[in-house]
Design a protein with these regions (language model features):
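Contiguous, well-folded functional domains in the mature portion of proteins
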Residues: 1-147
Length: 147
């Protein structure tokens, strides 16, 4: 049994406005590969999930594919995003999700990049190269409770 959790969840209540699938490579995303492959996250296949918080602020999630991860599933889209898809492809979306809802999963596992507004900050327990656990708070808007 793998120690990795390959599913990902909504970090907050939000509306999903659009998903852009960007076709690319499937390099490994381990620390060694990150040092060797320049702009690796910009080269690998990825899905740019554009969302809007109730406050009106944008929050973007970018699940990035990796070696052995040739497909990505999103519950709110009735399709599999994978190497057979041509990209970039834009999928308009109008799905509302609640904090903790499962958004999708990787067939094997990978990385998710979070692009948040400037007034968001990491929680104190988030440190470089540390393992993140499902349900662990990652970010918060300055002066508020964690996402």
């Amino acid at each position: 049994m793998s120690s990795m959790y390959h599913r990902f969840h909504a970090p907050h209540d939000f509306k999903i406005e659009q998903v852009t699938f960007v076709h690319g490579d499937v390099w490994n995303v381990n620390p060694i590969a990150l040092k060797r492959v320049e702009r690796l996250f910009c080269k690998n296949e990825r899905a740019v999930i554009q969302t809007r918080l109730a406050s009106g602020e944008a929050l973007t999630l970018v699940p990035v594919a990796a070696i052995l991860v040739a497909s990505l599933r999103l519950h709110f889209l009735d399709l599999t995003l994978n190497a057979q898809s041509c990209g970039p492809t834009v999928f308009p979306c109008d799905a509302s999700v609640r904090k903790g809802d499962e958004l999708g999963w990787f067939e094997h596992g990978s990385t998710i990049i979070v692009l948040a507004p400037d007034d968001f900050e990491f929680c104190d327990n988030v440190v470089e190269n540390a393992r993140i656990n499902a349900g662990q708070p990652l970010m918060r808007k300055a002066g508020t409770n964690p996402l």
